[in-house]
Amino acid sequence: MAAITSAMVKELRERTSAGMMDCKKARVESDGDMDKAIEWLREKGLSQAAKKASRIAAEGVVAQYTNEDGTVGAIVEVNCETDFVAKTDNFIGFANKVAKQVALANPADVDALMAQAFVDDSSKTISDLVSDATVAIGEKISVRRFSRYETTGVVSTYIHLGGKVGVMVEVTVDAAGRANEEVKTFAHDLALQIAAAKPEAVRREEVDTEKLEKEKEILRAQALNEGKPEKIVDRMVEGRIEKYYKEVCLLEQPFVKDGDKTIKSLMGEIAKAAGAELDIVKFSRFERGEGIEKRKDDLAAEIAAMTK
C-alpha cells in the first residue's frame, strides 16, 4: 500500500474542497490514486446529496453568460440553502459554469442540461458538477431554471444586487447596427429597465388576456365601490387600463434614467442615430427564490418530535 503523505491529502482537498479527514480516507481507500480518490469522494458526495434532498434551497444567485459578439446569451437560477453560501466564490463560480453550459450547449430543459457533458470537461456531466458542488459546499445545490437566446441581433444581460435579479433581453438589428455602441448601450439600458421596473410584456398585444380581464374586473369593482355612476364606470375602467398598460408594457414604461421618455421613444431616437431598424423581441427576468416557499423552522417542534 502506498504511503499517504500530508501533501497528497492537501492536494486532494484543494481539488475537491472536501473535508481533511474525508480526503485522507479517500486517499487510503484508493491506495493513493488521485483519480480514484476523487471518484470515491464523489460517490460519498452522492449519498450526502441524497440526505440533503429534502431540504429547501431558496437562496442562491442568478448568473449569466453571453458570447463574444453578443448573439447568444443565457441566464440561470441556481439555488442553495443559505445566503452565506450564495455569496461564496465556490458557489458563484459553479453558477457561472452552468450559465456558460446553457449558452454554449443549448439544452432543451433542466433535465437535458443535467445529462449533458460539461463543455469545459467532457468527462463530467452537469449532474456530476452539481454533486461535486454539494460535497464541496455542504448544502443542497439545485439548478432551478434557465433562459437562452440566440439571435442575429443583440442579446444583453444584467445581474443586479449580486445575483438577486437577472435579466436578459433580445433586440433585433442588422449586423452594422449590432456593432454600434449606442445600440449596445440601449440594449444594456433595456436590461437595467427590466430589472428595475418589472414589466410583464414587451407590448400590449402580449399582455396575458386572463390577467387583463381580471384587472378590468378589479378596476370596475373599485369604481363602483367609490360610488361612481354605472354609466361612467366603463370609461373610468378604460382610462385606468391605459395606466395599467404603462406599468406592465416595456415599450410604454417611462425610461428609468429619464422619466420624460418612454422606452418606445428612446428606441426611436437610438434607431435614428444609429441608422438602423430596432425592435425589442423578448425578455426574461428571474428573481432569486421567487415562488419558492421558504421553510420556517420550529425548533421546539423538531426537538419534541425527536424525543418521541
Regions found by a protein language model. Give the residues of each.
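N-terminal assembly/interaction segments in proteins that build large macromolecular machines
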Residues: 2-308
